[in-house]
């Protein structure tokens, strides 16, 4: 058993060791983007308890799906990204569909981070938006360029700092004398369904699982621990921020972005702290999403060794340039199309991991030290597909319905 797991065939993607801390940091960094600052506004109608319920449900089933991918990766000798795993265990169509979903999700996220960072640095430093975006993008690209280990190290430091900043501002919110938890603790089930859709799309770290499996092949039993711990920390952070904001403002006065609410309630220091947190959140997510997309490109197009300079230049150009161009080319309709594709990708990421796991158990290369437990039962797999599909259908109906006048 142990010998089989140690026998790895390296292809274009090389084995790079990650520690448990680094793997957890990558998951938290990927999930906690600047979108966390809008959750209070999204949950204002339904109430915080319903948000927590949906975050728990979405987080649980997303974690199950991630563990399916983890076992599939550990059953494969050669380190592969999602397209390679899908091609091996589902077929070429599955590989193409999952690559499209990865690209749509990654580009959509990086467009948001590029524009968002430009706006924040414009506010903080007085730079033009494009210059702020460039100042943000350069260090992001450098970390992605140096690969998985560099990403893990920087995620560890930056995610830790991000959590500390968030902890300071949340604690200050409750100690300010202006917070009243009863303002957040209400429930209106009429608005529950839209919030479920929002909760599901808060978790985007699924795409990073093959990278984590590649980095933890030397300690396969720690891979599920990293995934579960990373997702748990993510869920706590996603729940605590809206609670703090709604406790300060109430549903009637909550702002679309939490930075404004904190600034109005706590003062300028909170506004700046929240903006710095938002920059950190966007940066950690950019590293995880960008690094994942880069290796997906290498895997999908079967490029030469990922460490080959020419290969890396091509892959990083394909990863970095489209988001920056889209962010400042005024192609709003195209960005909207990417958002739709990302929704479609959510459905693909609910179905393909199920097929992947079931086929990997039949024709995988090796028997791994760790396997999924009861949560790989067909009934649970069916629930994952149904929940993700319903969320996507609701999203489509919401944005195709005519707006009320």
Tell where the protein language model's regions lie, with residue ranges.
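Helix-loop-helix connectors at the membrane interface of multi-pass transporters/channels
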Residues: 6, 10, 84-87, 114-135, ...
């Amino acid at each position: 058993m142990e010998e089989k797991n140690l026998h790895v065939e390296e292809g274009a993607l090389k084995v790079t060791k990650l520690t448990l801390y680094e793997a957890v940091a990558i998951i938290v960094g990927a999930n906690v983007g600047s979108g966390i600052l809008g959750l209070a506004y999204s949950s204002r109608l339904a109430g915080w308890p319903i948000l927590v319920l949906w975050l728990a449900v979405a987080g649980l089933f997303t974690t199950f799906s991630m563990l399916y991918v983890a076992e599939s990766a550990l059953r494969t000798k050669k380190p592969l990204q999602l397209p390679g795993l899908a091609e091996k265990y589902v077929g070429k169509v599955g590989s193409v569909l999952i690559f499209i979903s990865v690209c749509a999700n990654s580009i959509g996220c990086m467009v948001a981070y590029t524009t968002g960072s430009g706006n924040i640095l414009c506010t903080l430093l007085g730079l033009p938006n494009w210059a702020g975006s460039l100042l943000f993008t350069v260090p992001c690209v450098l970390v992605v360029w140096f690969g998985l280990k560099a990403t893990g190290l920087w995620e560890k430091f930056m995610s830790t700092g991000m959590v500390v900043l968030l902890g300071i501002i949340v604690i200050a919110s409750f100690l300010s004398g202006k917070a009243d938890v009863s303002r957040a603790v209400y429930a209106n089930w009429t608005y529950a369904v839209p919030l479920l859709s929002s909760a599901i799309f808060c978790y985007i770290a699924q795409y990073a699982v093959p990278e984590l499996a590649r980095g933890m092949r030397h300690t396969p039993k720690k891979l599920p621990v990293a995934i579960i711990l990373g997702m748990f920390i993510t869920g706590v952070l996603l729940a605590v921020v809206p609670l703090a904001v709604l406790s300060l403002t109430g549903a009637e006065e909550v702002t679309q972005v939490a930075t404004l609410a904190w600034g109005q309630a706590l003062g300028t220091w909170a506004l700046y702290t929240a903006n710095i947190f938002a920059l950190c959140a966007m940066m950690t997510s950019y590293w995880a999403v960008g690094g994942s997309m880069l290796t997906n490109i290498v895997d999908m197009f079967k490029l030469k060794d990922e460490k080959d300079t020419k290969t890396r230049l091509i892959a990083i150009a394909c990863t970095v340039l489209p988001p920056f161009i889209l962010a400042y080319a005024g192609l709003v309709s195209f960005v909207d199309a990417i958002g739709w594709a990302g929704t479609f990708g959510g459905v693909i990421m609910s179905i393909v991991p199920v097929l992947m796991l079931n086929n990997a158990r039949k024709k995988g290369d090796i028997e791994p030290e760790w396997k999924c437990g009861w949560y790989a039962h067909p009934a649970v797999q069916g629930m994952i597909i149904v929940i993700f599909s319903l969320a996507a259908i609701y999203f489509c109906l919401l944005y195709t319905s005519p707006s009320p006048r």
